[in-house]
Amino acid sequence: MGANVAYLVPDRFKYGYGLTPKIADVAFSTFQPDLLVTVDNGISSHAGVERAQAHGMQVIITDHHLTTKETPKAEAVVNPNQLGCEFPSKALAGVGVAFYLLANLSSYRSQSGKSSSKVAQYLDLVALGTYADVASLDYNNRILVDAGVKRIRQNQCRAGISALLEIAKRDPAGLKAQDLGFVLGPRLNAAGRMETMDIGIECLLAADLQTAYPLAQQLNQLNTERRQVESQMKQEALSELTQ
């Protein structure tokens, strides 16, 4: 749609969870953006929103977490679980909320005669994020996951997803929803647990298989290392119990 987009995945141990004032500072100093959009966080980030706005940024919060407090004074807050929201599907994962924001933006631009994005192309990511986040599969989430799985089976998906499935020796044509959570999810999550989540993001953003495959290989190796570390920790814990 013409926007110059960059992402920032904060280290929660260093900066805290969500849109904190420190993260607003980092976003400003690194990118100097006009607009800051949160994904899967921000519903309680009053101070962070204020700091971002003090830097001259507009803020859109997309989140799905429950709250009993007043929402931050951002330019827009998109959350089916915010107080007073009548959106019927309360079980949306963060990726689902972001998808509906994009769908509505695309529809608005199309009706205004402006260029818009075909949002169906993102359903593979929506399905992956919904299932891997263990969101409740209510009626709406089942539709989103089913649509995304069908696109992956037809090879209408990110090159990164295709690369991960190839490395895991999974045939996309026979993909099951469970594979999103038990084949793709662990490999992507291993990046954040062992190194940095950027590897997983770059894999999913890769424009072609040639770019995605080396990143998918890194993710697969990190997942192997994660499993080894977890197994060792389990053995050490059991050893302590038997002493």
Which functions belong to the PLM regions below?
Residues 25, 29-91, 99-111:
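Active-site cavity-forming subdomains of large catalytic enzyme subunits
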Residues 1-35, 55, 73, 107-243:
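Hydrophobic helix-and-loop "lid/oligomerization" segment in the mid-to-C-terminal part
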Residues 93-101, 124, 180:
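Catalytic-loop motifs flanking and including active-site residues across diverse enzymes
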Residues 44, 86-94, 120-123, 140:
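Short, well-structured alpha-helical patches and their helix-loop capping segments
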